[in-house]
Amino acid sequence: MSTHDQHGSGRTAPRRFRARLLAAAGACALLLTSGAVAPAATAADGDGDGDKTLTVAVAQSVDSLSPFLAVRLLSTSIHKLTYEYLTNYDAKDNHVIPGLATEWKASSDKLTWTYTIRSDSKWSDGQQATAEDAAWTFNKMMTDQGAATANGSFVGNFEKVTAPSPTQLVIRLKKPQATMTALDVPIVPKHVWEKVGDFSKFNNDKDFPVVGNGPFILTDYKPDSYVRLEANKDFWRGAPKFDNLVFRYYKDQDAAVAALRKGEVSFVAGSPSLTPAQADSLKGEENIRVNDAPGRRFYALATNPGARAKDGTKFGDGDPSLLDQRVRNALFMAVDRKAIVDKVFQGHAVEGAGYIPPRFSQYFYEPTADQELAYDPAGAAKLLDEAGYKTNADGKRVGKDGKPLNYRVLCHATDPNDKAVGKYLQEWWGELGISITLDCLDNVTDPWLAGKYDLAFDGWSVNPDPDFVLSIHTCAALPATPKDTGATDNFICDKKYDDLYAGQLGEYDAGKRADLVKQMQSRLYDTGYMNVMAYPNAVEAYRTDQIESITTMPSDAGNIYGQDGYWSWWSAVPADSGDSSGGSSSTGTVIGIVAGVVVLAGLGVLFAVRRRATADDRE
């Protein structure tokens, strides 16, 4: 899945966090590239006729190619490449810039927003992209629950959307909404999508090429294998330098790193980042550089609050002991976050605190000294005693029914961090008398959506505007019934949190809104259902002999894969092209890329709302 912005100014992170963030950033290089197609001979091989192909090896499969359903980082990244959004984010510093809309203005009461739609954007089938396409997209989401699956939170407050002319879009709101310049919704061609029947089941993966108006055109797809795109030579901002872009799935990230060494690919980001061992093994290698930049995701431990639907029906089998806040707090007090950063991430991360990473300083939250659940095993044991879970003669924590506590922790089989942290949890919680079973699966979707877990490794990539990742913890995000799929991340439903969410959504003053967002994070922290352990860096590596230049985001200490836009792939320049404009420079020839996509939860990428099989981001 994806998310959004708060432009320009913002409060800086607390001093000690800023210092840790800078230390964790390490040497932040900016670059990228790519090459090999399917049976990659060398990274520089193209498709013939002089075509240049950029191949991105990813560690995540596609959940859906429908922009109305997709939530995984890979899928939403593809949609950013193939469809325009009303606005975009500047690669330099994340401030809002024009996209399909060239300008926008609000009425004095902030309830009517008028967007001017550019006249130089065409769909890849030759038809003009107009305001009618945007109006139809939003109206479909407002009237069809299936079409609102991925991004429905953006239109829930819309009263009416019209297109008075081909270049004018008007959105009327029920109440003020602060995200009107950060609507993370791909605009689709009405003349194509109005033929679709059931939006809840249509995955847009049968007929190619797919009509779009982004910098690339989606031309082919094979599930769990590859996604192929071609450069849109008529893209209004200018055609990409590469003729083809291929995302190729790698389940084994060591194999992806090996491919980088061989020159079969030009860039590797890991799963979702390189492990310290992988990164260290690449340092000093000829023609390879490691980029270590502050990330935009969090790595957390989510606790099942008791899965339920909007109709009140409870389902799943979460351990009832976790409904006691003292138990939840005790568990987190027995987690040594510093050890996780030092030993698991080996310094390539920052200790966790609030829900939003310190990279977004205006929204970054840090608990007060009195509020913080610092590492305190003795205090954790005391809380468990107070909650009635005392140790028996065997040293096991038991409830009033005499049954020992044994929690199932859902983890991603493809994420080495989940497994490493899981072993520490077994040690730390074992000292409290609590047993845990690591349930590491390739596909965490089914048990997650069914509420059949006690705790789970969780993670999302956060956009400049945090509204989306905040919305997934509201009561409105719950599934309508146990058989439906909601947008909820972890079945949290808390009235105080919901009230704060509504307040920030309607607050146009940036400072006041940021304060409300911090209060929301404080509430999440106190309830203990979302415990952020770390903010991992984006650790990537690329071949300097295969890339001329590529854009990082932000331009200073930024990441390459999983950006809030299409800048990296759109700007990438083959090393032998003679065109080094518009990007971070290096040397090389670009033609193979391994961007290890984020796997669901622990990886930090978006948690798939609709299909959680193995992935993140939302953006």
List each model region and its residues.
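Extracellular/periplasmic solute-recognition and catalytic clefts
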Residues: 148-151, 160-162, 219-230, 246-314, ...
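Aromatic- and charge-enriched surface segment that lines or borders ligand/interaction sites
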Residues: 102-147, 170, 247, 256-259, ...
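Detector for C-terminal structural segments
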Residues: 47-49, 222, 296-299, 332-367, ...
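Surface-exposed binding/hinge segments that line
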Residues: 116, 150-196
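Secretory targeting and sorting signals
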Residues: 2-44, 591-612
